[in-house]
């Protein structure tokens, strides 16, 4: 019998490997797993985190899938926000600017002559929200009383009215045998705050 002679060629068969990029978002959400063929383009995920600005990755995400599994972590910077105080005619209060999520110490109440502070139009949060906010003071006008000591003359009813309102002077008191010469101090045109 004849021996077979001749060359045989063998071709290698390849299957492309898949690798994984594990993205740790560091925002309280689950890891993002990107598994794909070696050499294929990688699209980095877009991440958000309330109160923070995304600053990039702890190491570069390659443009195409490498021949290794890799893990990257998101890098975040905390944002600052401001609470402004519209005191609505009251004493000035400096705005509070601080990091998101930090404890807020409410300022002292504003003051306003002739008024009582009744609070803010919305609650001051316990921790800094992820937004700038403005709160507005709410006021109630005070009432004051002017009393008259007629020093032996006819009685005059005290005047009680809101701060800043126009005062109508009372009729002069009378006293038998005397002529009224006026009050020891001038009656103001508008109700004072004291």
Each model region followed by its residue ranges:
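Secondary-structure capping and domain/repeat boundary segments
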Residues: 1-194
């Amino acid at each position: 019998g004849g021996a077979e002679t001749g060359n045989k060629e063998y071709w290698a068969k390849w299957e492309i490997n898949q690798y994984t990029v594990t993205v740790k978002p560091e925002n309280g959400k689950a890891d993002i797993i990107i598994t794909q063929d070696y050499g294929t383009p990688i699209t980095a995920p877009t991440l958000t985190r309330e109160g923070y600005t995304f600053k990039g990755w702890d190491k570069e995400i390659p443009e195409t899938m490498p021949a290794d599994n890799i893990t990257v972590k998101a890098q975040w910077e905390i944002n600052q926000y401001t609470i402004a105080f519209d005191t609505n005619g009251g004493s000035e209060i400096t705005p509070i600017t601080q990091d998101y999520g930090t404890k807020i110490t409410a300022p002292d109440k504003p003051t306003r002559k002739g008024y009582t502070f009744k609070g803010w139009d919305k609650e001051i949060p316990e921790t800094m929200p992820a937004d700038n906010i403005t709160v507005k003071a709410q006021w109630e006008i005070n009432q004051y009383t002017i009393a008259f000591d007629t020093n032996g003359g006819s009685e005059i009813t005290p005047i009680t009215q809101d701060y800043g309102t126009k005062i109508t002077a009372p009729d002069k008191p009378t006293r038998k045998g005397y002529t009224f010469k006026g009050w020891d101090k001038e009656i103001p045109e508008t109700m004072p705050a004291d």
